[in-house]
Amino acid sequence: ADGLTNTYELGIAIPVRRTYAQSLFYSVNVRHRDIHDYILSGTYGTEKASDSIEGDLYGYCRDGRNSFSWTVGHVAGDLSLRRNNYSAPDAVGNYHKSLADLYYIYDIDRDWQLHLSMSGQYGWTPLDSSEQFYISGADAVRAFVQGEAGGRSGLLGTVELRRILGRSGLTATAFVDAGRIMGDGTKDLAGTGLGLIYQKSRDWYGKFDWATPLGCHYSESLGKDITSTAWLRLVKQF
């Protein structure tokens, strides 16, 4: 299977309040997507077009040791099919979904930090796979491969403890991830692991995570039990 998505987006963000200690913004984004999914070397597939508008409220508040950021939003869109061999027909047409993201950082001392995050989505209508909420992968439950579990509504959370390793630019991490897909065919995933982050201003950014499942080890995507999953991300900053 393979696929290609072209996304065109135009948006505006307006500050309502912005100080060092707190901020509040609202934004509106108009988005167009051309989506192509193929299997069997293109013999079967779908070609879809999506037009949507998204409105968000977001901001942060912080003091000496605490930092909290948040986003709430809603997406209204329309999905049309140009070619269809296997896409769910009830996902075609108008769709709506609501989103929320929360992120909290507590500075324990100069070297230790506690990071807590939670995100969620509620689909008010059936959603195409391109608009669904996924709870596995490098930015979700890291013990499972990308796309292991998804649906129109779900929750995802992470608790991560970080230790800065001197002035090397390295940070060691220990984490627990958990997520739930709700609705038809409820699915739960959880995992725990260790990681290493390298970050310096205008230099390379690197992130390595190793994770193992908590509870069920069976991967529907791979068709077998898994013991661990590793992720590596490298970014050159200029």
Q: Language-model segments: which ranges?
A:
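Transmembrane beta-strand segments of outer-membrane beta-barrel domains in Gram-negative
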Residues: 1-125, 182
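C-terminal transmembrane beta-barrel domains of outer membrane proteins
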Residues: 86-238
